[in-house]
A protein has these predicted regions:
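N-terminal leader/targeting and pre-domain segments
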Residues: 1-21
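Structural micro-motif
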Residues: 73-86
Length: 109
């Protein structure tokens, strides 16, 4: 999987704008959480849909960016968490064991 690193709040406006052309997926990962590591591993082993951009956010290193994601897209912060953005809005967010590529892919159509 070719993640795009999400490490600045300035990227959020570009993600929002790009979501009008194709879905944008943000995966918020905690390097201190075994559940987050398991969710990351499951995503990286899955076949990656080509009709979306996938962003990786290390929320320990970039907590302020994680907070900005929650505020910008009006989602409650969780870790791990996956967020799908379409047409400038969050259309799906899930956390912990419910994070699967099949569920993400279902939101991309």
């Amino acid at each position: 999987m070719n993640w795009i690193s999400l490490n600045s709040q300035e990227q959020l406006s570009a993600i929002k704008q790009q979501s009008f052309n194709k879905p944008q997926v943000i995966f918020k990962h905690s390097t201190r959480c075994s559940i987050s590591s398991m969710a990351l591993s499951r995503l990286e082993r899955a076949e990656v849909p080509q009709n979306a951009d996938f962003y990786f956010l290390d929320l320990i290193a970039f907590r302020s960016v994680s907070d900005a994601v929650a505020e910008e897209f009006q989602v409650h912060h969780e870790s791990p968490q996956v967020i799908v953005i379409k047409n400038g809005e969050c259309v799906y967010d899930e956390s912990h064991y419910a994070i699967t590529m099949d569920e993400i892919e279902a939101q991309l159509v």
